[in-house]
Amino acid sequence: GLGHTGGTIDKLEAIPGFNCALDPQAMMEAVENVGCCIAVQNEAIAPADGVLYAIRDVTDTIDSVPLITASIISKKAAEGLSALVLDVKTGRAAFMKTQEQARELAASMVQTAEGLGIQTVAQLTAMDQPIGTHIGNALEVIESVRVLQGEGSPDTRELVVVQGAALLAMTGVSADRDEGRRRMEAVLNNGSALDHFREMCIQQGVEEETAQLLVRNPERVVGTAP
């Protein structure tokens, strides 16, 4: 079924006070104030997706390409995006077990998003083994903070750099992906990416003192297994 492994929202909610249930006005305020936000699908953003999600779970259509496409792209289109980078997993631990299946899904999502006026690329990521070194909501928050600190596992960092570089090139912030890669490496190394994450946490409900501690010593905020 869906929802048993924990998604991005579950991981962020391991941070005390982090509010992912933003309405459209709160999303716009966050983007205006700190340049980014991460929010869960809700009744104001693609309300039909919640219904589709539940239907997929009980009708054995979790891996249906049209339904996956509808679920993912509906939310992106509702946000009014101009550019989108999709990370399509493939391998034993993914819904799409083979590269052929993953390419079919990627093509479906790119075609649908492009048809809605969203400049889109899809990148395939191997999921025959875990990415990074941490598994579990709180632990993956710790690993993510380590990457933002300029450290972290090399494969997780590489995903961030490659996908970020693609988005920078697509939006014209960088001349090409090579320049985008250099810019991504720079913001991870100089701490500015970490600063933006801290500001986003505060904007989305985390106490300032907690956010400050999170970016310095995440284990003290989200905890670790005994």
Predicted regions span which residues?
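Short acidic, glycine/serine/threonine-rich loops at helix termini
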Residues: 6-10, 41-43, 49-53, 95-100, ...
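Well-ordered secondary-structure scaffolds
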Residues: 61-64, 68, 78, 82-226
